[in-house]
Amino acid sequence: MNAASLTGITALSIGKDIKLNSAEELEAALRHIGATRYHSLHPFHKLLHGGKLNKGQVQAWALNRYYYQSTIPIKDAVVISRFRDRATRLEWRHRIEDHDGDVGSEGGIERWLKLTEGLGLDTAYVESTEGILPATRFAVEAYVHYCREKSPLEAIASSLTELFAPSIHEERIAGMLQHYDFVNPDIMSYFKRRLTQAPRDANFALEYVRTHARTPEERASVCNALIFKTNVLWVQLDALQHAYVEGHIPPGAFVPKEN
């Protein structure tokens, strides 16, 4: 199998004509999906990392992204609830701690709030999620629903966007520090921490799907789960682009005071 054989992938699935007959072919297909559909390719991210947004637009991104970040441990709790296997639950549990933290230790959600606070947003307003775009809420809730309703294999597979996360974190850290005078290293701590957390999580999930997707149909479902997740990430940026770059902010959503 080569990249040319994967050109028939749609916005929903890899299609019925693609047969993945081994774990190696599965991994190759997953990496192709990431290389062609990960949200690092979205025009909004190009603007964000290239210093082309104003402060209000960066605030809007951080505010909306908070809803996704703060929902991740809820999603992971749902994933854990799908498994009778104790070893899998133990492995997955640290993901909740990574984001929620623990008594006396900071987690990813607190680090994200450092970012929004550093950008000048009121923390109570951010945590209320009252100002996020409707599309943000719909996409994130759809992700939780997916992990609850689909198979445990698909629930794990939907996390495989983490295979491609380190590169976007590196690009974001470098680009935002270089281009925005209102960004400093302290408020970028979330991304620095994920440089080590994401590869660990991705490696487990990749090995899990390689081992447990044993038929072409199961391998297709794994690929389709990753396609779904790339759509979840992509559509959130579509909404930000439409609202804050093209100027179509929906009623009641956050309106930046700075530009």
From Swiss-Prot:
It catalyses: 6-(2-amino-2-carboxyethyl)-7,8-dioxo-1,2,3,4,7,8-hexahydroquinoline-2,4-dicarboxylate + 3 O2 = pyrroloquinoline quinone + 2 H2O2 + 2 H2O + H(+). Gene3D superfamilies: Heme oxygenase-like. Pfam families: TENA_THI-4 (PF03070). One of its GO terms (biological process) is sulfur compound metabolic process. One of its GO terms (molecular function) is pyrroloquinoline-quinone synthase activity. Pathway: Cofactor biosynthesis; pyrroloquinoline quinone biosynthesis. Keywords: Oxidoreductase, PQQ biosynthesis. Its EC number is 1.3.3.11. The keyword Transmembrane helix does not apply. It comes from the Bacteria. Ring cyclization and eight-electron oxidation of 3a-(2-amino-2-carboxyethyl)-4,5-dioxo-4,5,6,7,8,9-hexahydroquinoline-7,9-dicarboxylic-acid to PQQ. Belongs to the PqqC family. This is Pyrroloquinoline-quinone synthase. The gene is pqqC.
